[in-house]
UniProtKB/Swiss-Prot annotation:
UMP binds at residues 55, 75, 136-143. This is Uridylate kinase. InterPro entries: AceGlu_kinase-like_sf, Asp/Glu/Uridylate_kinase, Uridylate_kinase, Uridylate_kinase_bac. Pfam families: AA_kinase. ATP binds at residues 13-16, 56, 60, 163-164, 169, 172. Homohexamer. It comes from the Bacteria. Disulfide bonds: none annotated. Belongs to the UMP kinase family. It catalyses: UMP + ATP = UDP + ADP. Allosterically activated by GTP. Inhibited by UTP. The gene is pyrH.
Length: 240
């Protein structure tokens, strides 16, 4: 790790599905270990890292609502799924000597600390990787929105969205071979075109707080370090 990073502090958003690997459900420990190693490489560059992980590999609140159930209860279940994923990532980080802490938007003191903006930034100043669990702590908000919110609260230089593909495309490249990848977009263009990268609330929050969004493939070994050094394939969303 000799390259100079382009960012001092970042928020990494990973989907819960990213942790499944090829299993189709739950957590593939080897995938969690690989993501942890990518974060370790980022720390070796001197970059402060916060993380938000979704819970879709375990449970989705909207699945309850779609079958006539209570959306609020479903979302609470989804928030608990993010706590499970966050604990798994913390375990993988600790195995390779990376100091990390889980801060939950839902109080559960026997399991992890509760979130506060002041404590989160203090931990990051100390060099710890901070994993934000429990979404925003409120129903009806996605973990994408939680990622944008936490990025604003910790004053991150960039919000990195690790996805299944290497950027934002004009259409789903897995379904449309003619889909083209964008090198750069503005927040407004993402919203106006309805590009499926993050929900509109998350993109709008990032725009209002002038937060740079970088979309890249989370499946590339060392991909995070490459992005932090201004290398690698990605799409940058910025109004500057």
């Amino acid at each position: 790790m000799t390259g100079k990073p382009a960012y001092k502090r970042v928020l990494l958003k990973a989907s819960g599905e990213a942790l499944m690997g090829s299993q189709g459900f739950g957590i593939d420990v080897s995938v969690a270990d690989r993501i942890a190693n990518d974060i370790k490489q980022a720390r070796a560059l001197g970059v402060e890292v916060g993380v938000v992980i979704g819970g879709g590999n375990i449970f989705r609140g909207v699945a309850v609502a779609s079958k006539g159930g209570d959306r609020v209860t479903g979302d609470h279940m989804g928030m608990l799924a993010t706590v499970i994923n966050s604990l798994a990532l913390r375990t993988s980080l600790h195995k390779i000597g990376v100091d990390s802490v889980v801060l939950s938007a839902i109080a559960m003191p026997e399991i992890c600390e509760s979130f506060s903006q002041r404590q989160a930034t203090a931990y990051m100043d100390e060099g710890k990787v901070v994993i934000f669990a429990g979404g925003t702590g409120n129903p009806f908000f996605t973990t994408d929105s939680a990622a944008a919110l936490r990025a604003a609260e910790i004053e991150a230089d960039a919000l990195l969205k690790g996805t299944q593909v290497d950027g934002i495309y004009s259409a789903d490249p897995k379904k449309d071979p003619g889909a083209t990848r964008f090198e750069q977009l503005t927040h407004e263009e993402v919203l106006d075109r309805g590009l499926a990268v993050m929900d509109t609330a998350a993109v709008a929050l990032a725009r209002e707080n002038n937060i740079l969004i970088i979309v890249y493939s989370i499946h590339e070994n060392g991909g995070l370090a490459d992005i932090l050094q201004g290398k690698g394939r990605c799409t940058i969303v910025s109004d500057n």
